[in-house]
Amino acid sequence: DLNNLNLKEVDKDTVFFIAVHGFGGEDGQVQDLLSKKGYRFTGSDYESTKKCWDKVLSKEILIQNNINTPKFITIDKHENLNLNDEFFSEITEYFVKPAKNGSSLGVSRVTNLNDLESAVNDAKKFSDQVIIEECYGDAEYTVAILNGIALEPLEILPDPKQSFYDYKAKYLSGETKKVEIIDKALAEELKAMAIKAFYSHDCNTWGRVDFVTKGESIAVLEINTVPGFTEKSLVPLAAKKSGINYQQLITEIIEDVL
C-alpha cells in the first residue's frame, strides 16, 4: 500500500529495487512517488512504465514504430459490444483482456461469438477499457532485456490443461515449461524485435518482452517493466541460461542506477 510508504526517515542515498507486481508497481505509481521525492530506483521511469501498463497506448506505440502486434479493437466500460463491427468478420478467434491489468487476470480466449459478451463483462471487472484482440494462438516466446542486451529467448509451453498461458498456468500449475529455442535464426529475430519494442517505449535497464505467433507471423504481445522476479521467474531463468546467476542479475540491475 503506497499510502503506508513512509519515506521521511529514508536516507536520500537509498536505491529502491522495484519489484511490485500489478497496481502500484507496474502502472508507474511507485516510480512517480519516488521520483517526486528525489529517490533513485531500479528499472524504467514513471512515463515508460505507464506506457507499458496501458495496453492500448502500448499497442499504438508499437504500430507507430512498425512493430507487429495483434489487431485489436477497444470497448469502454459503459459501451455495448457491437458484433457488426468489421473486425468480427475478418477474425474468428479472439483474446479478450483488460486494457490495464497484469498476470492474465480477466483474460479469456474466445472461439465462439456467443461467448464474447461474457468475456468482455469479465474483463470489465478489472479495467474501464477492454481490448478484443486477434488470437495469435500458436507458440509463445519471451525475451528478457538487461542493460541494453537481449538475453536468451525462451519458449513458453503452457500447462496443456489450460487453453493459454493464463493465471493458473503462470502461478499455480507445475506443468508449465520454459525452454530454450533451438532455432537460432528465430532466437536472433526475437532478440532484435525485443530490443526495438523495449526502447520504443523509452524503457530502461531491465524488463521483458512477450511474443505470440500465428503461423509464420510473430507479434509483440506486451512489454513488462516490472516482471516477476523470484528465482523461478522468466527473467532470472533467462539470465541463468545466459550465464548470469540470480545474485549477479540483482547486482547488474542496481549498478545501472549508481
Predicted feature descriptions by range:
Residues 111-189, 213, 218-219:
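Phosphate-binding site of ATP-dependent enzymes
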Residues 134, 143, 198-231, 239:
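Conserved metal-phosphate-binding beta-hairpin within the catalytic cores
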Residues 40-41, 69, 94, 246:
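Hydrophobic beta-strand scaffold residues
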Residues 155-207, 237-258:
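Active-site "cap" helix and flanking loop/linker of ATP-utilizing ligase/carboxylase catalytic domains
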Residues 9-10, 51-133, 137-139:
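Active-site nucleotide/adenylate-binding loops and adjacent lid/helix of ATP-dependent enzymes
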Residues 1-47, 51-53, 57, 76-84, ...:
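ATP-binding N-terminal substructure of ATP-dependent carboxylate-amine bond-forming enzymes
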Residues 32-41, 112-117, 242:
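A glycine- and small-aliphatic-rich helix-loop capping segment at beta-alpha/alpha-beta transitions
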